[in-house]
Amino acid sequence: MFTETACASAPGDAGRPNEDLAVAGPSWVVVIDGATAPAGVDSGCAHDVAWLVARLGGALAARLSADAPAPVPTPLPGLLAAAIADTAGAHGSGCDLGNPDSPSATVALVRAAAGRLDYLVLGDSPVLLGLAGGGVRVVADDRLERLPGGRPYSLELVRRLRNAPGGFWVAAARPEAAAEAVHGSVDLRAVRAAGLCTDGVTRLVDWYGWSWDDLAAELETRGPRAAVEAVRALETARGPMRGKLHDDATAVWARLPGA
């Protein structure tokens, strides 16, 4: 069980919905980052990315809550696969779930159960494990950064390699993507807290010179809101390395007993 869970989230553009989501229970935390479709692209779906994020978050929350009393917890990839299937089933007959531009999202997830802290990362929203002995362990899925040819990626390359061997994996309409997530567990006594961030917050590390230890310290001492404010200040002062000035930004810091 977590003793305290703090969260902050801010949209990248006040005129658009926030396509990030954070949801938490007594023993678990989920952070989801919806992938904004490029302008003019036909997703083949009647729903937008915010709909997918809300549906997937609700399905994961329901699955995690129902599984919490189980003496032997269901592995996180299995829960995510079921939640993706639940979400796919909520689409209507007019939605083309085979469209390579259909709505998708990254998922970061932690759960305290049976003396372990389980973690799962699918896409570029990492988990930071604050270790009981000091320091931080980063659980990240960097496959999106290792596509052939380097950035900027063409739309056709992303379409071809999304949820494909040798490419990158996200939560969309294929439950089998969950098996490709980075996942594992550690002894609960070895961890004092867990941080989960979307890439709108990890810009601090990726673009602006912070270390992962710096980010974990900010989350632990000043809180998620301060981390979001820090990235906004740097974006305004220095500009983005690529893409839009501001992205949706979400951070969570969940403390464990003894922290």
Where in the sequence are the language-model features?
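PP2C/PPM-type serine/threonine phosphatase catalytic domain
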Residues: M1-A259
